[in-house]
Amino acid sequence: MDGGLTALQERLKHSFSDTRLLQLALTHRSFSADHNERLEFLGDSVLNLAVSHLLYTRLSALPEGDLSRVRANLVKQDTLHRLALELQLSPLLRLGEGEARSGGPNRPSILADALEALIGAVYLDAGFSAAEALVRRLYESVEINPRMDAVAKDPKTELQEWLQGHKMKLPVYRVAATLGAAHKQTFDVECEVPELGLRERGIGGSRRAGEQAAAAAMLIRLKARGAA
């Protein structure tokens, strides 16, 4: 098996009995007619149930409406994108040549969908208990509390507040490249924290979305350094 897939299984703490499921979960529709969208559909349901169970047990005093609000925040694309970055899924995605050239490996929607597909693949490979255990491991790095807003702080705001809290200047964003046809452009944006000598890139369907993706990548970098 490819070394990258072996390392991914170690990060997931799940060894696939059927490695074809793992490969399928990482296959975008631009790569093959046999792609991950059905697994994504399944994984979305498994994720929602696993997160619902997690919240039901952890936030036992919270009423239904508030549980739904917190769950919506935990399963939205921004959260899944950041978890996918932590798992280092980008270089393992199987994308068509055009999608790969236009920034697909770093596109938040593609990464979030692949994460859901992975959860679906674990469910088919080993059942709900294994999939739920994976979800709980993934969310160990996510702060869960009853006051989580329906729309949580976006990555740019979170990064800005962290830098200000550490008496550092605001990050610098610049468009490194504009990719794709004029009617379907994607923006490759660089986020730089000069005082730390750090740069990260992000891809989005607009400049703002690219900045958010780059900020999310920077937060992951800071977390890996033990800073954030």
From Swiss-Prot:
HAMAP family reported for this sequence: RNase_III
Function: Digests double-stranded RNA. Involved in the processing of primary rRNA transcript to yield the immediate precursors to the large and small rRNAs (23S and 16S). Processes some mRNAs, and tRNAs when they are encoded in the rRNA operon. Processes pre-crRNA and tracrRNA of type II CRISPR loci if present in the organism.
Statement: the UniProt record of this protein carries the keyword Cytoplasm: yes
Cofactor(s), names only, from the UniProt record: Mg(2+)
Record-given protein name: Ribonuclease 3
Known partners and oligomeric status: Homodimer.
GO molecular function, one term: double-stranded RNA binding
InterPro entries: dsRBD_dom, RNase_III, RNase_III_dom, RNase_III_sf
Record CDD domains: DSRM_RNAse_III_family (cd10845), RIBOc (cd00593)
Entry similarity comment: Belongs to the ribonuclease III family.
GO cellular component: a single term: cytoplasm
Ranges for domain RNase III: 5-127
A GO BP entry: rRNA processing
Gene3D superfamilies reported in the protein's UniProt record: 3.30.160.20, Ribonuclease III domain (1.10.1520.10)
Keywords in alphabetical order: Cytoplasm, Endonuclease, Hydrolase, Magnesium, Metal-binding, mRNA processing, Nuclease, RNA-binding, rRNA processing, rRNA-binding, tRNA processing
Chief localization: cytoplasm
